[in-house]
UniProtKB/Swiss-Prot annotation:
BP GO annotations: axonemal central apparatus assembly; axoneme assembly; cilium assembly; cilium movement; cilium movement involved in cell motility; motile cilium assembly; radial spoke assembly
Organism (species): Danio rerio
Annotated protein name in UniProt: Radial spoke head protein 9 homolog
UniProt subcellular location: Cytoplasm, Cytoskeleton, Cilium axoneme; Cytoplasm, Cytoskeleton, Flagellum axoneme; Cell projection, Kinocilium
The keyword Transport is annotated on this UniProt entry: no
């Protein structure tokens, strides 16, 4: 959610139990303005909160010229002092998946360690090597934020446009989805690099608007039933909840450009979802 409309956006998400104290709201409102100025971001988004045992991580993201690429993630333990997270590389995500388990501790320097025996060769020529993988919690935090963004970050169709030079920008003429369209899952898109779009046929691509339909719709997710779509406040607010990452909520006010998402949870994927559907 955009930091410029933080209070209004938090009020829309509060119906789902996702809220912050008055002190935290006030601190975020001031500190995110400083982050925007110091890092020279075009926009700053409040991403959410990951719950830890000792303390919680508040997450923000800075946006540069391209809304989709090169987003910078930052974390804070007190809503005032912000620190950049390292970029989440494929090797980092793999190490985190291997070594880090259980809940976050709340200590960015906490070290996770995993040791395994790897065997190379066969028979008498086989050699055994002990391999230890170590990751700190700050790296785990960066990997989890990246994974959640890839899996469930959502925007309404038309909220962003892709220019001929490939840059993704906010669509200033977007006035919101019609209430009828807002109730359909196909009008919400994954805000990440497209995956399923590349597999479409030429005939299917010819029916799409390249300026608007450059992302994957939620209706094409392989895991059907992983989204809960509801209309709250007498049908004036459309709310999407992820059942894969419990604590993720997207909201959109139909016929207005107001939309956003927030995650407040323990940072653990719901691996039981396939058995729950």
């Amino acid at each position: 959610m955009d930091s410029d409309s933080l209070h209004y956006s938090l009020d829309l998400a509060a119906a789902n139990g996702l809220t912050l104290s008055s002190e935290q709201r006030a601190a975020l409102q001031s500190s995110l303005l400083i982050v925007k100025r110091n890092y020279k971001f075009s926009r700053v988004l409040f991403w959410g909160k990951i719950l830890g045992i000792k303390s919680d991580y508040f997450i923000a993201q800075g946006v540069e010229d391209d809304e989709l690429k090169n987003r910078k993630s930052l974390y804070s333990l007190n809503c005032v002092d912000w620190h950049l997270l390292p970029p989440a590389t494929e090797s980092m995500i793999a190490d985190v998946a291997l070594a880090a388990t259980g809940r976050f501790t709340g200590d960015p320097s906490h070290e996770y360690e995993h040791t395994e025996i790897r065997t190379e060769g066969e028979g008498d020529e086989a050699t055994h090597e002990e391999v230890t993988v170590k990751v700190i919690e700050a790296s785990r935090l960066a990997a989890i934020v990246s994974n959640i963004d890839k899996d469930v970050s959502v925007v309404p169709r038309g909220a962003f446009i892709k220019s001929p030079n490939g840059k993704v920008q906010t669509n200033r003429s977007f006035g919101g989805l019609h209430p009828t369209e807002a109730a359909k899952l196909r009008n919400y898109l994954h805000f990440r690099e497209p995956v399923n779009l590349r597999n479409k046929s030429i005939l299917e691509m010819s029916e799409l608007n390249p300026a608007l339909d450059f992302l994957d719709p939620l209706s094409e997710d392989i895991l059907k039933g992983s989204w809960s779509l509801q209309l709250d406040r007498g049908g004036t607010v459309c709310v999407l909840r992820s059942l894969l990452w419990l604590g993720f909520t997207f909201f959109h006010v139909p016929q207005t450009p107001q939309h956003g998402y927030i995650y407040m949870g323990d940072g653990l994927m719901n691996l039981d979802l396939p058995f729950m559907l």
